[in-house]
Amino acid sequence: MSESETTDEPDSETASSERTGQLESCQRCGREQGLVGKYDIWLCRQCFREISRGMGFRKYS
């Protein structure tokens, strides 16, 4: 066997986080789905909608 064919198996915990790529969660409620990560906000879309005006975002129609 060559070095590239080694049988090292990653830990199941590490493998699951790498598989989904989901490393962040909402800073307010902890939800892991529907995250707004732009500008490193890391809020779920529901929390972002509730507090976005207070953060200085404006809603355009």
Swiss-Prot record:
Its cofactor is Zn(2+). The keyword Aminoacyl-tRNA synthetase does not apply. Keywords: Metal-binding, Ribonucleoprotein, Ribosomal protein, RNA-binding, rRNA-binding, Zinc. Zn(2+) binds at C26, C29, C44, C47. GO terms for molecular function: rRNA binding; structural constituent of ribosome; zinc ion binding. Belongs to the universal ribosomal protein uS14 family. Zinc-binding uS14 subfamily. Part of the 30S ribosomal subunit. Binds 16S rRNA, required for the assembly of 30S particles. This is Small ribosomal subunit protein uS14. The gene is rps14.
